[in-house]
Amino acid sequence: MGRPSYRSAAAISLLMCLILSALCASSESAVVHGSSFATERAVKSSPYLVLSPADEMVGMSTANEAFDKSPSYYDDDDDDFVKNEKRRLRFHKRRIRFNKRPQEVSGLKPVMMSRASASADENSLFDLYNTDGAMYQRDLRAPRLRFYSLRKRAAGDEDKSEENNPETESHSRRKRSALTPSIRSLRSSLESGIAKRISINQDLKAIADMLIVEQKQEREKYLADLRQRLLNKGKRSSEVALAASDKGDEERELLNTLSNLLE
């Protein structure tokens, strides 16, 4: 067997490198009708589905949705989460801003993406497109505001919408005059409040005076009962003392008679 050809191995490796580089270069660009249209990165960040002059739809990858719903996007770190949310909102605002620009781009007809694909994530808190028509709120705890179109306002349906909408029912033009009280009603309510306060104070004072009188009567009654009990106790003690003295005299007389008999 002969020696292996190192030159042929080097040529094969060089050929493989060239093939890989060509494949990488071809993957970075998307060819539309034989002309280099846009890179893959531009397609990812583009807000439009671009149509050719013959109105043939050009396929576009759902890279935005993949970025929005990727598991690495919902990271445990709060800082990364906030950064990713800001980045995604920046892309959505870019879509809205491009929609307002004049649609004249070198003969190509830019068309906005469908509502389903433009909305990044239906379950996301930062979704710009919702079924109820509410726009993105910077403070999630704040109530969502509903905006009515200019056509309805011009047609005079603003009052009807305010009446049907419970959020703006208290601020409607018809009920605004009824909600604002007049000076006379304010004065009458103030006078009635003052009169009620005075009557309450008088009732409290009468109750306090009645309690004081009752306490005084109870105290006088208690002192009279105590005095009577002391008097009764003194009488009993004096009678006991008198009875004891009488018994002593009788005992003395008995002792004297016994002594006389013994003699």
From Swiss-Prot:
Gene Ontology MF term list: hormone activity
Transferase is among the record's keywords: no
Keyword field: Amidation, Cleavage on pair of basic residues, Hormone, Neuropeptide, Secreted, Signal
Tissue: Bag cell neurons.
Annotated region described as Disordered, given as residue ranges: 154-180
Record's signal peptide: 1-29
Homology family: Belongs to the molluscan ELH family.
Reported function: ELH acts as a neurotransmitter locally, upon neurons of the abdominal ganglion and as a hormone by diffusing into the circulating hemolymph and modulating the activity of other organs. It specifically causes contraction of smooth muscle in the ovotestis and expulsion of the egg string. Alpha-BCP decreases the activity of a cluster of neurons in the left upper quadrant of the abdominal ganglion.
Protein name per the record: ELH type 1
Lineage of origin: Eukaryota, Metazoa, Spiralia, Lophotrochozoa, Mollusca
